[in-house]
Amino acid sequence: MKLNVNLPRKPYDIIIEKGSLSKVGQWVKELWQPQKIALITDNRVGSLYAEKVKLGLEDAGFEIVVFDFLEGEASKNLTTVNKAYEFLLKQGMTRSDGIIALGGGVVGDLAGFVASTYMRGIHFLQIPTSLTAQVDSSIGGKTGVNTPLAKNMVGTFTQPDGVLIDPDTLNTLGKRELIEGMGEVIKYGLIADVELWEILKDLDGSTDSILENAEKIIYHSCNVKRQIVVEDELDNGVRLYLNFGHTIGHAIEATAGYGKVMHGEAVAIGMVQISRIAETKGLMLQGITEKIEAMCLKFGLPTDYSPWNVEPMYQALKHDKKTRGQMIKMVVVPQLGQAAINQISLEEMKEYLEK
């Protein structure tokens, strides 16, 4: 399966194919001339796939160096970025060379940020290995790292030269890591793809049902993301729809401590909680929140977070990129397959969270 992200400045393809990791050398050679490549990964994914990818690229004529870091959201910071810069400099990486991100969302976000800022930008490719990264973070060009106060607060818009998705990599994920990716998948069905929502309704919620339908799930999700990014690359309009569940979700991630609550889990909680607020305000059809919660619970995703720690969450919301003055943009789903943007005051949001 192939999807094209047809951006005027930099179009690129998303390849979705089981077993495609075995063809990585051929894929990269079609995009880049033989050169030096830094493979950026984390210690867990690196132990599984780095050698296979390295050998495939070397067989295609590339010189490969590998930079890895400790897995997890806690590593997605400027300290790790600086270590990557030092590594690239010591390896003699130049602007004609490239970086490949091999891993989940943390790896992709961090490697993309490094690629976009090292020497003011070098070539970059994404090979996402987690469900969250395959359906969401590897597409669209957002890169970034966290600060102690807020998630993805430092970042760039930098499109990759291509995205290679091998659904077989999902087989090596732990149960929790696979399930958390369904938070983003459910989001896509809710904001723009009723057909995807119906596919999810037919699944029994087991990990086997996710893996058996992975290509279909990934394709639908990537297609929604692709269409939205092409319409609004720089996040000034409809791309905000992709933040459904993320406002409260990011606040939970920041206040719980990065990595304690996984991203897709936080998104699931955020979707349910923001929908409860929206239904109370008459911004959504009655009963949609119940459907969202039931879908999340079916796949084993959390829908509530305790303790709420409302004051730290309130402080995190104040730093959210959607906050303007004392108001914050709130993405809601008026009906299934449709998203809308409303505003709510930070104080009103705090009052709802305290209930």
Swiss-Prot record:
Any one GO cellular component localisation term in the record: cytoplasm
Keywords, in A-Z order: Amino-acid biosynthesis, Aromatic amino acid biosynthesis, Cobalt, Cytoplasm, Lyase, Metal-binding, NAD, Nucleotide-binding, Zinc
Pfam families xrefs: DHQ_synthase (PF01761), DHQS_C (PF24621)
Cofactor: NAD(+); Co(2+); Zn(2+)
E.C. code: 4.2.3.4
SUPFAM superfamilies: Dehydroquinate synthase-like
Ranges that cross the membrane: none
Compartment(s) of residence: Cytoplasm
Record-listed NAD(+) binding positions: 71-76, 105-109, 129-130, 142, 151, 169-172
Family, similarity comment: Belongs to the sugar phosphate cyclases superfamily. Dehydroquinate synthase family.
HAMAP family associated with the record: DHQ_synthase
Protein name as annotated: 3-dehydroquinate synthase
Phylogenetic lineage: Bacteria, Bacillati, Bacillota, Bacilli, Lactobacillales
Chain's gene name: aroB
